[in-house]
Curated annotation (Swiss-Prot):
Annotated function: Part of an energy-coupled inorganic carbon pump.
Cellular component aspect of the GO annotation: plasma membrane
Binding site for Zn(2+): 347, 349, 509, 524
Family: Belongs to the inorganic carbon transporter (TC 9.A.2) DabA family.
Keyword S-adenosyl-L-methionine: no
Protein's name according to its UniProt entry: Probable inorganic carbon transporter subunit DabA
Subcellular location: Cell inner membrane
Sorted UniProt keywords: Cell inner membrane, Cell membrane, Membrane, Metal-binding, Transport, Zinc
Cofactor(s) demanded: Zn(2+)
Name of a matching Pfam family: DabA
MF GO annotations: zinc ion binding
Membrane topology: Peripheral membrane protein
InterPro entries: DabA
Organism annotation: Marinomonas sp. (strain MWYL1)
């Protein structure tokens, strides 16, 4: 008797599978939620090509429907000139019939079908869909496996931590319910014959499904995109392990998920081969034909999408033309050379633009600046006497310094810890009903009280004690005064203040909402999805420190002795600005400055009311402000603010060039003056860090609009938290949902975000921009592969840098 030799996985096949897992971009958990370009791992290829492939792979949409674009054209949002220009770009020159041609619905061909999908085409209507049950089973298993509060699945050997695939196989082999749900009596036994080793499984699938290199790559990508939510979260786990220098050999999470999906495909194939050979023969015919036609499939989708691409480009051209005219037709604001009364440094966030403009209207002696919201501090925050630690910097970076309150009184710490325990209990997935049940009438009263008399809810770690001093450590060692001075100098060198006002406000931002699982997504993305309060408090503490000031002076950085750095927080939901006293002996904020802030708040609220609630436009300032606060605290409110919706540009220039302009809260604003940057090192940092963050934000909003099913999270009302902070389900099943909810994008009547790729405007010499793009592949990819637009804005002229050439905008 001869034993059949099992197939082995070649290095080429292993690399193709690895490459497929690396195409998935990470998605951060709810408590650290930041915006991410869901296609970040693919920016080394042209955007149009990726759009064609994603459409062919999984029916993913990166453009709006032609009907939507045509409606925007009829509204005047897309100009005929820009439409013609976009059509010429794609080789469509039939001017007379152009509009009629572009207005036709783009009938897309079918997308790739996995084995389960092909089986469903022949499945009786009274039976559970293979695809739906696979998604449900895998998704529910992942939720249980990665449950953060407490494990909900047992393992046979608790001392031997299983990887995702091995644990799934162990649990599934004991799951008799699958056969019942699917109405397939013998289904479960087909899992018993699956190999426990992932590579052995991959080799079996490749052999039995007759996959060559091209179809293997396509198949693997399609399977991961089919459960893109969990793929993205597991990519985050891989990323976080890699950033912490942990070895992925223990468990590459995305690879394990791919193994589970392939295992299901193999089980369906083998099961039908055993129980319905005629049906499998039909499926095999389609499968073989599909594999051989992959290039044709992509080409068919490319051809079908051409009209959508023209419309999308025309929309971008139209938006850019309007902004170009705004930037070049008005003279720059002439700022006074005298010392300002007040300087306020804000985050570059688009929501800051509205408030900055309102604040500047109060006096010509006010100067505002834009800077990355983490204020250059590479920190993580550790709550005092607690194990709770969270990053306070962009997701792309790793914290080098830990900050902790050094003088919080014991009463405050005890209260904070008690609130944290209550918060964890109330937010744990299994606790929702047991909490109400065990607390009985008292909790019912609390819920009733919150409904009638709502108040601000926040994580206990955000309730910092007043007048806090900070302890800064690096790898457990306290920073010396010299270390602090060097840290402060590096930040001030980047901000490049040429003069210092008596009051310099360091304004972080945060969003205060109630009953909002995605609250972190409205916080400061540059602070890792947290409020910027810790960052501004720590930096103000450093810059007000007498010893640090003395050392800075010795380094040649003279700060006037009467200059006080004041930490503040801009509440983006209510547009209230709160100042924090850094020390007990700090000078009180002048009444005039407080009045400026209040008037700016009223102006900003009036502007935002037009989009949030038009009924508030006729209200008094006080009534409107009260309504904004009520809206923020209302736990039934699904749309407390519009966040960064409708962002479309990033302007890197001196503020005096835009101070006179109404940019409608759509532009990220980063102060930059090339005259203060002789070696262009600051510009290089901006183009390789903040620009990437703004691109991530822009693409998350764009793709959440164009395909909310794959890249958005659907209806917020139906959300249920998964495993603590992992993410959300829409309802009680399906894939993990990522991205933005419909309530963050659409007011029920129209889209509040226009999906256009980011336009970046830089005031700097062309040669400097060219050198930075040539030096950094990621910058070059974003520009030349059409993931964003890069313009030079100089002397009231705009020129686009693309494919290593400059093109004047007309």
């Amino acid at each position: 008797m001869t034993t059949k030799t099992l197939p082995t996985l070649s290095m080429q096949q292993k690399n193709l599978l690895l490459e497929a897992t690396r195409t998935i971009a990470p998605h951060w958990p709810l408590d650290k939620l930041i915006a991410v370009n869901p296609l970040w791992s693919l920016v080394d290829k042209p955007f149009d090509d990726i759009s064609d492939e994603l459409s062919a792979l999984a029916g993913i949409k990166t453009y709006m429907s032609n009907e939507t674009y045509r409606a925007w054209f009829d509204e005047g949002k897309i100009s005929h000139h820009c439409l013609t220009k976009a059509a010429e770009h794609y080789g469509l020159n039939e001017q007379d019939a152009l509009l009629e041609h572009l207005s036709q619905a783009n009938n897309l061909p079918d997308s790739w079908r996995n084995i389960a999908d092909l089986a469903d085409q022949q499945r009786p209507a009274n039976k559970m869909s293979w695809h739906d049950e696979i998604t449900h089973q895998v998704s529910q298993f992942c939720a249980a496996h990665y449950q953060q509060q407490s494990p909900t699945l047992r393992q046979q050997n608790i001392d031997n931590e299983l990887d995702l695939y091995s644990h799934w196989l162990e649990v599934t082999n004991e799951d008799k319910g699958l056969s019942i749900v699917m109405g397939e009596a013998k289904l479960t036994k087909f899992f018993h014959n699956l190999p426990t080793d992932k590579d052995a499984l991959f080799a079996l699938v490749i052999e039995e499904l007759a996959l060559d290199d091209q179809s293997l790559s396509f198949f693997a990508k399609a399977l991961l995109l089919d459960i893109n939510g969990w793929s993205s979260y597991l990519a985050y786990l891989n990323w976080s392990k890699g950033e912490n220098n942990d070895n992925l050999a223990k468990d590459d999470h995305v690879e394990s998920l791919l193994a589970i999906k392939m295992a299901w495909e193999l089980v369906v194939w083998r099961y039908l081969k055993h129980t319905a050979p005629a049906l499998l023969s039909t499926i095999n015919t389609k499968w073989m034909a599909q594999k051989q036609a992959i290039p044709n499939l992509i080409q068919a989708h490319k051809d079908a999408l051409i009209t959508s691409k023209v419309w999308a480009l025309a929309l971008e051209y139209s938006e850019q033309k309007s902004l170009n005219q705004t930037l070049t037709t008005e003279p720059a604001h002439n700022t006074t050379q005298t010392r300002p009364e007040l300087q306020a440094i804000f985050c570059i966030d688009v929501r800051s633009e509205v408030f900055r403009r309102a604040l500047e209207q109060q006096s010509a002696t006010i100067q505002t600046l834009g800077f990355a919201g983490f204020f250059g501090l590479p920190i993580e925050y550790k709550a005092k006497d607690s194990h709770y630690v969270r990053p306070q910097l962009p997701g792309l970076l790793q914290a080098a310094i830990t900050v902790t309150e050094s003088d919080s009184d014991k009463g405050h710490v005890h209260h904070q810890q008690k609130e944290a325990r209550w918060y964890r209990w109330g937010h744990a997935a299994p606790a929702a009903f047991s909490m109400v049940e065990s607390m009985g009438w008292w909790y019912a009263f609390k819920m009733f009280k919150q409904t009638l008399f709502s108040k601000r809810q926040e994580h206990p770690a955000n309730r910092l004690a007043p007048n806090t001093h900070w302890q800064l450590t690096q790898q457990g060692v306290l920073l010396t005064d010299q270390d602090k001075a060097h840290l402060a100098k590096g930040i001030l060198d980047t901000i490049k203040l040429t003069t210092y006002a008596p009051i310099v406000m360091l304004v972080g931002h945060g969003s205060h909402t109630s009953n909002n699982l995605h609250a972190a997504g409205l916080e400061c993305g540059a602070c890792g999805g947290q409020s910027g309060e810790v960052n501004v408090r720590v930096l103000a503490s450093l810059l007000n420190d007498h010893k640090v000031r003395t050392l800075l002076n010795d380094m040649g950085m003279e700060i006037p002795s009467d200059t006080q750095f004041v930490p503040a927080l801009h509440n983006t939901t209510t547009d209230q600005l709160t100042c924090f006293d850094q020390t007990k002996d700090a000078k009180p904020i002048d009444r005039k400055i407080k009045d400026w802030f209040e008037k700016a708040q009223f102006l900003a609220q009036q502007e935002r009311a037009a989009k949030l609630d038009t009924a508030l436009l006729d209200a008094s300032d006080k009534q409107r402000s009260k309504a904004f606060s009520k809206r923020a605290n209302d736990w039934s409110q699904v749309n407390p603010e519009w966040g960064l919706a409708n962002n479309h540009s990033f302007i890197i220039a001196p503020r005096q060039k835009t101070r006179h302009l109404d940019l409608e809260g759509r532009s990220f604003l980063h102060d930059y003056d090339p005259q203060n940057d002789p070696d262009f090192a600051i510009l290089e940092r901006i183009l390789t860090a903040p620009m990437l963050v703004t691109h991530w934000i822009n693409m998350q909003y764009n793709l959440s609009v164009t395909d909310n099913f794959k890249f958005g999270c659907g209806n917020k009302v139906l959300h249920n938290a998964v495993g603590g902070n992992i993410g959300v389900f829409e309802g009680n099943g399906g894939d993990l949902r990522i991205g933005l909810s419909m309530q963050s994008l659409n007011d029920g009547q129209k889209w509040m975000h226009t999906p256009v790729r980011l336009a970046v405007y830089v005031t700097a010499p062309k040669s400097a921009i060219e050198k930075i793009a040539a030096k950094h592949d990621i910058v070059k990819h974003l520009i030349d592969n059409d993931w964003l637009y890069l313009f030079q804005w100089e002397d009231n002229k705009v020129a686009r840098f693309y494919q290593q050439e400059w093109h004047a905008e007309k």
